[in-house]
């Protein structure tokens, strides 16, 4: 596609608004992926990728998930996923896992599957491709997963207990509350009853033939995609797909995959829940709106929407983070972004999320709403938008620089989403060109106009979910109180946000340069060792792991084991405190603003026996990296606001540690291994 055509469409979009979206050109599809469809409807994606060499990833994506279950089938999609590993036409019993492990594929790490609301995906990765017979056997596994899962009675019976165990591990704390809340959040509609884990009563009681009927109904080639990416012969793979899959028939009068719509809510919905295992008081405010239909996602307007969502989320998150540093801020952290409403694909929502300080849930709810309302009324500033653009383009440049070092899973994930929901798949080069034309020409006025639309001003499609710690002394908000807060915030007279930016260099005066006193070259291992005039030793090594990336580490052989017991906790958290501090004349918040768009960062490290720094940058930003290293070593400055915020966050989590199963388990193991020593246990709040 001609870039001039894209640019003309962008100008049209900016001048005429979103009504012109449908007239914009299509997003180009990456020409390096071979996409085809067999006569029976099966779709395939094949891409040669030699990073890393001699391995490939094999996927089969099913355009079916828990939303396709009937009321008496809740959990069958998930149970069926488990049974794909317990016997197929060509791999009886556990021989599928045994075979893959024999060629180096490990179950859990390289071999797995997942069931979602609207898709089920099976995969195995890092398969050696030097033997054509191994590749062909892997193709046969995909064929069996398509229409050859055995579903024997013995396998079904044994897998019921496995699903029970998974349910016990997953449905804890916050997950429990979400599952309880979904029916009300979806006003009794189907999405409210289709959490993928399902009902254990269905898992226990379903007859084998019921599961087989579900399998035959939905696991069909017209609902499936074969995705293979790696160091393979594309033509051989395509021929093998045609050979293995062309003969699979689609039943007459096959059931259609139909989108399930989500109704608007005329009045606000408020759900308040509590759980003993919940670690923090958390709330989410959803402002619902229609999702972009799959049919329009290949349109350039969808790409523009994604960019606007990205920068809006970035800018409002920065405001929330800055506000959280104030001593009287009632929340610990907050963010916002536009995306799917809970688990549905047909309804989106601009979602505000906040974690309240203990006892401050209502105040935090108001504060998070207030900042969103401020965006609605005044929008963002030019300096905020410039930082967001710089950060966005920095990521674009990074992706372009590493386009030849993309791993297989970066592609397979894209192709799964393209098949199941028509997400665009342009090449990195084409997308980079688009952004380099679009971003400089998309004005702040358009961003602010779009942001204004996202923050709703009526109770229609407003939904709030509050999930709190269950404690004897806790006071929980009521629906009436939350509704009153919404009305109050909307009626407040707010002032526009003022973006205070420090217009100074990171280092006011460059330090006096030292000298290289000695250079030793190790040709065998390919590095140079420099000895500087201050005694520091520097090892330089050129690598080709990633293009356009520089990594850095500095280490000294003294760690927190040298500190006394009274300083142990201070030493344990020292690296976190130092990283949250300011540098030179910059507070941590001012530093974040100054580094926007830079691919450079340095952090402290502290272990029992070592301390040091680690970081990374690009060649373009290596000067910034060096400045940060120098400041981390010489000019860490106290930032009381940042320290207090971090301390409050840690205290909130640790105060409820006795109700956190994973922390209790960790504490018990550490206490046993180290004979009850407090130095090894989870800290007290």
What are these regions (language model features)?
Residues 160, 211-242, 462, 667:
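Non-catalytic, conformational "gating/processing" segments within enzyme and secreted inhibitor domains
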Residues 203-211:
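Alpha-helical scaffold elements lining the catalytic groove of polysaccharide deacetylases
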